[in-house]
């Protein structure tokens, strides 16, 4: 379906708005993916906080032109799918990686994070990033570790003193 000028402007405006809020962008080739497979992927994307869109490359280049994702313009060749991580930086990476395991037709083409263009192989790195909740749990564990070690040391010292006192008490009473 051909879009008129006003519809194209709306698409560019929408994509630019999403790009300014997104943490990361993955561009992937989707040629050969069936409609039911794409529908399942879109459903999975909505559930994981990923904005998934198939847009003409010319419109995408215009939309991304004034954002940190302008670095990806040189990779916009052929039919592409744009996956923006809205909630955490690794969400789109996990989605694309998981979906491409089941469907070999989906191939990542480029990754952009923080205004830097990375090769397609960096999808695995992006997918391995912890979610916000996982990162907070790791931070809490790291912060609580010294306190836990200190408490264990105090307990061990108290146990040693009580054992020493229990062992030395009978000897002193005999002497």
Swiss-Prot record:
Domain of life: Bacteria
Listed GO CC annotations: large ribosomal subunit
Ribosomal protein is among the record's keywords: yes
A GO BP annotation: translation
Record-level Gene Ontology MF annotations: large ribosomal subunit rRNA binding; structural constituent of ribosome
Disulfide bonds: none
Matching SUPFAM superfamilies: Ribosomal protein L10-like (SSF160369)
PANTHER family: 39S RIBOSOMAL PROTEIN L10, MITOCHONDRIAL
Quaternary structure, from the entry: Part of the ribosomal stalk of the 50S ribosomal subunit. The N-terminus interacts with L11 and the large rRNA to form the base of the stalk. The C-terminus forms an elongated spine to which L12 dimers bind in a sequential fashion forming a multimeric L10(L12)X complex.
The protein's role, per its UniProt record: Forms part of the ribosomal stalk, playing a central role in the interaction of the ribosome with GTP-bound translation factors.
Similarity comment: family membership: Belongs to the universal ribosomal protein uL10 family.
Protein name, UniProt field: Large ribosomal subunit protein uL10
Organism: Xylella fastidiosa (strain Temecula1 / ATCC 700964)
């Amino acid at each position: 379906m051909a879009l008129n000028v006003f519809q194209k402007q709306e698409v560019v405006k929408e994509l630019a708005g999403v790009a300014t809020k997104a943490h990361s962008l993955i561009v992937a080739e989707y040629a050969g993916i069936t409609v039911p497979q794409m529908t399942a992927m879109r459903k999975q994307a909505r559930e994981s906080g990923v904005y998934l869109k198939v847009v003409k490359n010319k419109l995408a280049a215009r939309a991304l032109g004034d954002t940190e994702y302008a670095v990806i313009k040189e990779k916009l060749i052929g039919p592409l799918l744009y996956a923006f991580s809205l909630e955490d930086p690794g969400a789109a990476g996990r989605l694309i990686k998981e979906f491409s395991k089941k469907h070999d037709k989906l191939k990542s083409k480029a990754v952009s994070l923080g205004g830097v263009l990375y090769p397609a192989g960096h999808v695995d790195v992006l997918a391995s990033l912890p979610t916000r909740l996982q990162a907070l749990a790791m931070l809490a564990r790291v912060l609580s570790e010294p306190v836990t070690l200190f408490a264990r040391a105090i307990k061990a010292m108290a146990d040693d003193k009580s054992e020493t006192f229990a062992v030395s008490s009978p000897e002193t009473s005999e002497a």
